[in-house]
């Protein structure tokens, strides 16, 4: 173990900061010698108090305590939630009660919260007492404990009330860091890196050097069990002794910087605000992401953004930004809010641009409304001595990923520009490989600092190829190559992002590695696009040369696995080089290390031959000379040997990147010079100026080492008929945008510029040729693809360039940079402020080769830019497809049709598509001829194609049962699900499946038992799916239709078409505690009457297997007609049955609930935060209820525990909060209501248990848990039925008595009173429903509309139209139907007219097996008011055509005219018309009286319709609106003669009535008892 001494740091003229390791004795001695007092008060929080070292410190203090002194201890609850005025007051009350006086010394032992709050206590207690800081977190050690800032938080914001109060001493004992959790340790490193970054370049470099070892040690922290006074506890332990010197030094150096700055500016009037580097933007992020994101994590992101701002303003070099970003990442800190792990950690919270700017506007550094930010000049030095005012425009650009480019109109006022592009990516990557394989140190200057080279450097280190260090403040990389002798396999994959060059070069390097221990291979992988790019020809050549390489996913692309035991033999190697010259360069550079000399023979002329020449010339610089064969074309001889590194190697600027500023000059008529690229360049793209721009009318001056271009007047570039860009393929994109602006009336080529020799550009970061054609068309520029090139039609004048909605960049740096130029030529000549800018998406992709391109375009070339925030996609605008997976016979075909109909999607069966796409017969035929393996490969290719084409186009894609058999297809499924696509696993009972498959001759036979196939695939189905749905065996038509109805609602809910919302009105859910729901279905149907949801207590189930739980959930949906489910697992500590510490099973079950698409999921707030994080991140459409139960009665409603839990729930972004306490007296109900009234940020379910807590259940507003008389017992003490709640609520005035009426004449036989009164009685509502017979609407107005107790009116004939004149507003249905059957009184005295007849029709049909969206024709018999309601209902059910027949057609013609044209109503007059119809009719409604026989002509028409064949996916169904008798003549004819399903008008009556019931009362009517009451005579 390293040893460190004690260091004292001076601040404000005193050596009061003491830094060391294990300072217990020193602290005690110093405090008692220097701070003499009668009372010492040690304040810490509960987390710190349980650390053994805290007890050891207190013991040392007790031991050294002077004889006449005493020591008191006070422990507060941990966390920012308790950093309040209330907690401060409690500490002060304690000190007053203990008789503390002005000589008291307070010791704050803890993190920043304790230091801030206890310091504020010391500042105000007895008008100020002495205090000592003992910081226990890294953040507190280097930041909050230094400088004397003290404060508490308020509801208005953090640290709003406090003071400056300097501590007597700050004892920084780094031993505390041993028990600091890993994330907190890393969190503190942000402040450490910040101080080095702004003040101490040498320390910054030291931090860079030690990052790897630091993270290795901190990541190795482990949980240990320790005994404390409070009992055994678990703590994080990090063995910092391994890095003690480094940790001590980083703490000390950071403190020195802050102490120096504070001493110069104690009250933060100038210099001290430099310490806020990263904080202006970081604090804004923190305000939105707290508490999931820690302070240091947000400051880390803020530092990167503020460094990028400094670069954007031409103050900081790109190299310095890259260093800062790299070191932050190296210490485990986030550098962007979009990093995957950080987004997951922060629950995907959004950080809207305008909110960030608003948060920044309240920064204390600001100058009024002007935002001020600390800018960086270089690592170790700030720009100026205080923060600088920056514009919102510049901030917007830095904070967003979309660039807005304004016309380049104003740039011509500037003089010539000298631009030095970053180092060449091609040369940088080659130099790194050669230097790493070479022997000795090589200083590489002007290296490109980009994503590509970053991945290459990391890979070189990971393979132990070289030792890497930096000089010249990070501008020079020093590669100490090991000569190829130390290359060893890696146990971690080499992740290469989308770095194609690195992947190809490293594939050959990997063939040279040696195994070591368990490490016997190298895996190369990358991002999704990288895994599509080709590497096949290179791999094939390596394989033929003895290297064992496996593809781990798609054949021909990464990831690949290179086995270390195989050898790169050498000898003659044949290579196909028409796709990429990088294959050739890769083998060339590694060839000297083969076992024998290499002869590399290329199969024909290689693409981009100049890049091969570049490689050969560079190899010679490093000591290996390649000889070209004199006898064979494109053949090279490479001797064995070892590279000898030159002392220095200077990378040329990237010639491809240089084309952008040169093209800028060409387009704008300005002058640009590139000072380090000329005609002697290694790079083919150096010819761009002479070969492309000069013939187009530019003035070009090129020397051996520099290139200058001056453009003609804007709009006068001349077209170039043809250019072969094979030597400079990457520059073709720049040529395209210049060509788009070229025009000449004398041109022989008709302004069509042909570019060839660029076929390889189709397999770069994207298909660049197609990308250019597609994006140019958005500007109004015509372009066509050629087999090896592109043709671009230049516009006749710049004013013809159009403004595109947005430019897609395809995550391709060259696409983005090219179109940033053309964008500036749109509306050229107009003032930028008067024009709509061009939006360029994903602008940060330029970081691959030129991270500072936008900065150069803005600050050096003078372009006007702004930033734009991508708008979140509206779910309604996205038709994200649904993929169905599951075993054969799982119902994918049937359910697929249901799914497509419910969503209005198209259905695509992958097996049918296979036959069409490949033209090789059916799947069964193909398998018989070619075997399963060949089929699986083809299936994967097809599936990838289908997803690419249809994933956002509204398709239901039904796959074969074995789609999960291949890793490639599983990856496609997982990626689709990860981006929000629905992958739905359908399954049935496996025994039923086996039984069915044994009798199905249409499918290719399995070569193994079905159960074995299921056992193998089951885990894959779970892994790949985002949702699961269990389909039970249906033995009757009714069961089948019930399942269809349930599935339709399920699929619409999980896709967001039927959103699930937390109720905003009084609502309840019934609690089910059965061990098995299946035997209790009838009881459950009755138990849910009047409820908005049903809770299944999963902890009570007899079996926790996924299969059992999913079967229970489907059964519950079927029993309750898809009532929303509350999925609850209650642990024992929270009053349930589930084991408290079985977190793995609990999380698995919660995931089952989410994948089952439950509408609500109860998530206990006491569960470990990682479980919270994972569940919240995959909540999909499920609403989360954050719950906390106090069964022990430990906490009153005034206790801070509830405040803490409420803040926790808000921070977790749950959708509703549920708090359950235990009432000890009636007054607890009043305390609860006081709490409820103050906590309104989220919907709150808050109740007390026990008898004396019943009132709280009555007063609770939303989702009150209830029991039912039909259940065996209540789920919790004091639980009430819905009827009891309503009766009690009414008795205390919560529900006022109301009167409802049916009006019209005659109404003597009306069943409405019995319908509604049955519902009121069942639910305990204080309402009555009576008849009010009249044929005068005016009497209704005078007698009823003026009543204060009026709750609603049902209107029947003859008043449905007459009453409308007295109403204030009509619903859309009432307007369209032209009649009102429901009057709704509003609180403001207005009356709304509604029509529920159409709902009665629609819901009656749906209840009898008709889907919500029929997608077929409908038939209406009759022409009265009910016929109009039927027409409206049919339109809402998406009937394609509505046919109408009647005894007299004149009435129908008038009715047809009164409806909108989109209803597509057709009046049928004759039988001949019916015979000519081809469209099937699936639903019908009879609206003619049932007390008289049908007219013969009408009866014939009806029979003609009913006898036509029906091609619907459901039984054709007819409703007779007449409800007496139950079976009318029309229903008898339809069912008995023509096989239609009959639906009685009594159902329509009840359905329209329960719709009224819900509108008037807010409660769901109990359908079954209401229906029974209505239909019984």
From Swiss-Prot:
The active site is at residues 268, 283, 845, 1189, 1218. GO terms for biological process: amino acid biosynthetic process; aromatic amino acid family biosynthetic process; chorismate biosynthetic process. Residues 405-863 are annotated as: EPSP synthase. One of its GO terms (cellular component) is cytoplasm. Its EC number is 4.2.3.4, 2.5.1.19, 2.7.1.71, 4.2.1.10. Keywords: Amino-acid biosynthesis, Aromatic amino acid biosynthesis, ATP-binding, Cytoplasm, Kinase, Lyase, Metal-binding, Multifunctional enzyme, NADP, Nucleotide-binding, Oxidoreductase, Transferase, Zinc. This is Pentafunctional AROM polypeptide. It comes from Eremothecium gossypii (strain ATCC 10895 / CBS 109.51 / FGSC 9923 / NRRL Y-1056) (Yeast). The gene is ARO1.
